[in-house]
């Protein structure tokens, strides 16, 4: 996709600003101990790169895969990015968060059916989009990416990035994760990924009071509308 006149908006849900029902959903995923810190690590640190991954696919992949496959790919990009640029302590904490969350979801798939197979079969139906089932699918995608530990170069090639220019490895340290940190994480990640050869337009972020609303959208900068 041509970047001219376009931008990426990454929308992130706020912790504790939703309804009691929405907030209770968060607590059920992350547990009652250090819930806010776990939420911020997952959504303010990890998931913003996941969402940026959708932007990478939109502007670099000539033929985007099925949404199920793209979800797996963008998690592999996010994990690969933080394995290359992240603090090991945060990667380990992410793994613990995902393991705990998976223990709380009820598996909707029959025995022997993978999360990818199940999602392919049910994509576009209410079966996928209820909270338990989509959460189970998404956390399995993250877990699979953590197990694969794919290198960043391969993850970007898989996303359709051409003429990759491998960059020096370094550690991006974010000692405190707050709403104000999110734009810094996104801007640093976008800068580094462009150095790798990734085609990206401007990337913006916004927040939503629903703690479960996390997504990325392509914006027409002339009309202000979503594409």
Predicted regions and their residues:
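Active-site scaffold of zinc-dependent metalloenzymes
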Residues: 1-40, 55
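Soluble non-cytosolic domains of exported or imported proteins
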Residues: 35-43, 47, 64, 68
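Amphipathic repeat-derived elements
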Residues: 43, 49-57, 205, 209-213
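Active-site recognition of the HExxH zinc-binding catalytic motif
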Residues: 46-59, 71, 75, 79
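Hydrophobic alpha-helical membrane-insertion segments
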Residues: 59-63, 84
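Glycine- and acidic-residue-rich phosphate-binding/metal-coordinating active-site segment common to enzymes
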Residues: 67-90
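Long, well-structured alpha-helical subdomains associated
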Residues: 85-210, 222
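Alpha-helical solenoid repeat scaffolds
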Residues: 212-227
């Amino acid at each position: 996709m041509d970047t001219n006149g376009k931008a990426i908006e990454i929308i992130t849900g706020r912790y504790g600003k939703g309804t009691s029902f929405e907030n209770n959903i968060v607590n059920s995923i992350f547990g009652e101990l250090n819930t806010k810190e776990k939420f911020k690590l997952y959504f303010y640190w990890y998931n913003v790169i996941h969402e940026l991954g959708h932007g990478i696919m939109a502007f670099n992949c000539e033929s985007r895969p099925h949404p199920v496959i793209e979800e797996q790919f963008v998690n592999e990009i996010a994990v690969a990015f933080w394995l290359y640029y992240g603090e090991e302590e945060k990667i380990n904490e992410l793994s613990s968060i995902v393991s705990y969350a998976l223990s709380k979801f009820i598996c909707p798939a029959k025995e022997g059916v993978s999360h990818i197979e199940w999602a392919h079969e049910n994509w576009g139906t209410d079966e996928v989009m209820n909270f338990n089932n989509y959460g189970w699918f998404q956390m399995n995608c993250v877990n699979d990416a953590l197990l694969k530990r794919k290198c960043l170069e391969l993850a970007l090639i898989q996303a359709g990035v051409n003429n990759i220019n491998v960059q020096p490895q370094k550690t991006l340290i974010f000692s405190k994760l707050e709403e104000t940190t999110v734009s810094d994480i996104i801007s640093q990640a976008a800068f580094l990924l462009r150095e790798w050869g990734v085609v990206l337009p401007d990337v913006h972020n916004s927040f939503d009071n629903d703690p479960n609303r996390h997504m990325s959208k392509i914006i027409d900068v002339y009309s202000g509308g979503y594409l």
